Regions:
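Short, structured coil segments at secondary-structure junctions
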Residues: 70, 101, 121-123, 179, ...
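C-terminal helix-to-coil terminal segments
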Residues: 280-309
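Glycine-rich phosphate/diphosphate-binding loop of Rossmann-like nucleotide-binding domains
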Residues: 53-66, 148-226
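Active-site cofactor/substrate anionic-group-binding motifs, chiefly glycine-
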Residues: 47-101
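Anion-binding alpha/beta catalytic cores of soluble intermediary-metabolism enzymes, centered on
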Residues: 30-32, 95, 103-175, 266
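Positively charged, low-complexity intrinsically disordered leader regions
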Residues: 1-61, 65
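Rossmann-like adenosine-cofactor binding region
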Residues: 202-278, 283-284
Length: 309
């Protein structure tokens, strides 16, 4: 049994095995419909319990299809219907019930502490579907997409992030350290990652550089990532924050500083941080990126169940 909570805590050899398995599984599904089961049904009889404390479209759909295609089933719980939320039941007791009824637990949460507490009391694998500090399933899937399109290992590419510092960027930073790729981050100085993340970068002496100039961050990029400037439940003056990111908006002019074959990726949903003429262009691979979540999350599930070949 293995958990999947934060990329920085998972050996890079395991992360690479997940990517290799996902690549193989995607090839085998070329002629199959969405709900057809993979040969061998490796997770037949297994139940994935999911709980979403934050809104979700891609994570919810992709985990639903992932477990179904592996031959298993899934049940999605709404926190507002549980005693955990309204009846004062403890995480310890809830985790015991989840462990008795299910075979794995996927949590999308507004609390890193809650994620760790569930991990402490569960006797089944736990997967982080998004937390305030990280989004590991998203970034591992994005690495899969980058390597699929570029036909190169990510360690040979120049990766750029332009936008706010958030949980997705934290996981991209962890991936940069794990996979040893160059990462340029373009954001206003005020919106750099937390001191904890900066220390993590410094401790690992990685090829990560910050720029208070979007053009400098984009220069020579093979891939440009972005995310919404106004995140879910972001309690800030929205118009003021958007104004501070004006010079970091991704448009055709900014993309011209990157390599000619640079691709644009965005974890979605989008906001005002990218123009339509980039988001809807041939350089944008956001739909392929979203669909690849299914393939990588299948391999993450197999990893957690100890069934990776």
């Amino acid at each position: 049994m293995k958990n999947f909570i934060n990329l920085k805590d998972i050996p890079v050899s395991d992360l690479k095995k997940i990517l290799i398995d996902a690549k193989r599984r995607k090839k085998l599904r070329k002629k199959l419909d969405n709900l057809q089961i993979d040969k061998g049904a490796p997770l037949k009889g297994k139940l994935l319990i999911q709980m979403y404390e934050k809104s979700s479209l891609r994570t919810r759909l992709s985990f639903y299809l992932a477990i179904k295609q592996l031959g298993g089933s899934t049940l999605t719980l709404r926190p507002d219907e549980l005693h955990l939320s309204k009846g004062g039941e403890s995480i310890q007791d809830t985790a015991k019930i989840l462990s008795n009824f299910g075979n794995a637990f996927m949590l999308r949460t507004d609390s890193d502490e809650k994620l760790e507490e569930f991990k402490k009391y569960l006797s089944i694998p736990i997967i982080n579907g998004l937390s305030p500090s990280s989004h590991p399933t998203q970034i591992l899937s994005d690495i899969f997409t980058v390597e699929e399109i570029k036909k190169k290992t990510i360690s040979t590419l120049n990766i750029t992030w332009i936008g706010d510092s958030n949980n997705v960027l934290n996981s991209l930073i962890a991936a940069s350290i794990k996979f040893s790729f160059k990462l340029s981050i373009g954001c206003p100085n005020k919106y750099k990652p937390s001191k904890k993340i900066i220390r993590y970068i410094e401790d690992n002496k990685n090829k990560i550089h910050f720029f208070n100039d979007a053009k400098k961050a984009a220069k020579g990029a093979d891939v440009i990532f972005s995310d919404k400037v106004i995140s879910m439940n972001d309690k800030v003056n929205k118009s003021k924050k958007l104004n501070q990111f004006k010079k970091f908006k991704i448009n055709k002019k900014l993309m011209s500083f990157a390599k000619k074959d640079c691709i644009f990726l965005h974890c979605l949903p989008r906001g005002k941080e990218v123009d339509d003429n980039v988001f809807l262009s041939k350089q944008s691979k956001v739909w392929q990126q979203a669909l690849n979540r299914v393939h990588v999350q299948k391999s993450i599930l197999l990893y957690c169940f100890g069934k990776l070949r």
